[in-house]
A protein has these predicted regions:
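N-terminal glycine/serine-rich phosphate-binding loop of ATP-dependent small-molecule kinases
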Residues: 1-14
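ATP-binding/phosphotransfer module of carbohydrate and carboxylate kinases, centering on a glycine-rich
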Residues: 1-3, 18-29, 68-203
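Generic detector of well-ordered alpha-helical packing
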Residues: 10-12, 20, 61, 87
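Active-site glycine-centered loops adjacent to acidic/histidine catalytic or metal-binding residues
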Residues: 11, 37, 197
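Short, glycine/serine-rich, charged loops/turns that create anion-binding
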Residues: 13, 49, 156
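Glycine-rich phosphate-binding loop of actin/hexokinase-like ATP-binding domains
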Residues: 26-88
């Protein structure tokens, strides 16, 4: 299609633009998005624009090293590094934590059901995921003075079990003036990425 203009971007950046123009980000200025699914992705609106950085690799939040500080086995990420956020806070990471705590094989959907039923290993797996998210968010705040965070994707539906440790850990690792940070969980917003892809032409 030599006569047609097109744009190409990753799903996390598209979801971030979807939130900026059509979702929770409409009411915010500068904010970060964590996409929580099979992996962990992210995007950042700063100065009113989606930031891309050198080579388009700005805000690869899924690969912030947080796992080496946790009281459980360090895991190798698909990127090749150890202890990435993705190894703890993605559906894959939560499943690995559950197996480590319980010794049982379960799917991510089954673990969510176990958490709803009060299963201790499932609740702990989500708590660890929330703790890791809190560490990552605190790092971003201390580096960039950003305090508005949107969490989207399938894992974000587990807000009930993620939020307590996320907030506790965030406050433990940030200055008091940042303790009014917003943590917004969007659920069922499956069109954010599609709408954001369309919004690439608005940037």
């Amino acid at each position: 299609f030599p006569s047609k203009a097109f744009s190409l971007d990753n799903d996390a950046n598209a979801a971030t633009l979807g939130e900026k123009y059509f979702g929770a980000g409409k009411a915010l200025g500068n904010f970060c998005v964590f996409t929580l699914g099979t992996g962990v992705g992210g995007g950042c609106i700063f100065g009113g624009r989606l930031q891309r950085g050198r080579n388009g690799n700005f805000f690869e939040v899924g690969h912030v090293p947080v796992g080496l500080t946790m009281d459980l086995s360090a895991r190798r990420c698909g990127c090749g590094n150890m202890g990435c956020l993705e190894t703890l806070s993605s559906a894959t990471g939560i499943t690995a934590s559950y197996i480590e705590f319980s010794g049982k094989q379960r799917t991510a959907a089954e673990i969510a059901g176990e958490a709803r039923a009060g299963d201790a290993a499932a609740v702990k797996a989500y708590a660890i995921a929330g703790q890791a998210l809190g560490l990552a968010a605190a790092t971003i705040t201390q580096l960039m003075n950003l305090t508005d965070f949107i969490f989207t994707g399938g894992v974000a539906a587990a807000e009930t079990w993620l939020r307590p440790e996320l907030e506790r850990t965030y406050r433990a690792h940030t200055f008091a003036l940042f303790h009014n940070a917003q943590f917004i969980f969007t659920q069922g917003d499956e069109d954010a990425g599609i709408l954001g892809a369309a919004a690439l032409f608005l940037e």
